[in-house]
């Protein structure tokens, strides 16, 4: 007997942040499975215009993590509930600058993290995805 996978697509309240609405890609911004939220890789998209930022890496990381925060809050969770994060940088030499901004969003007790470097689509300097616990922030990840 195969167990049914109960998953629900989640989307940001701001439609400008939903890449699947702007393209014909087979993409959802995130899904909820049980007590977990899985957010797809997010790019530095300006929430006011829907345009990609190609500014300094600090700006791109800040926009991307702010969008991730918005997405988690749209799903009833928060950055404090993130248990795993994956950062891709187009240029690994920018890791120190990325870390500086990252610490603004995760100042204490950061989640598990992996950082890779590779060429990214559309000239993006970063792409970030995460896994978080669903539900309101109770100060706990467990």
Regions found by a protein language model. Name each.
Residues 1-66, 70-80, 89-142:
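N-terminal presequence-like segments and the immediate start of the first folded domain
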């Amino acid at each position: 007997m195969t167990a049914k996978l109960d998953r629900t697509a989640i989307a940001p309240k701001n439609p400008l942040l939903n890449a699947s609405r702007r393209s014909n890609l087979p993409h959802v911004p995130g899904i909820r499975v049980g007590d977990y939220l899985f957010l797809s890789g997010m790019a530095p998209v300006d929430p006011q215009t829907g345009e990609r930022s190609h500014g300094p890496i600090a700006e791109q990381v800040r926009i991307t993590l702010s969008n991730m925060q918005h997405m988690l809050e749209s799903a009833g969770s928060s950055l404090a509930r993130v248990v795993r994060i994956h950062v891709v940088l187009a240029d690994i030499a920018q890791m120190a600058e990325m870390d500086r901004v990252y610490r603004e969003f995760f100042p204490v007790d950061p989640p598990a993290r992996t950082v890779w470097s590779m060429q990214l689509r559309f000239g993006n300097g970063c792409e970030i995805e995460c896994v978080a616990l669903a539900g309101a922030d109770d100060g706990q990840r467990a």
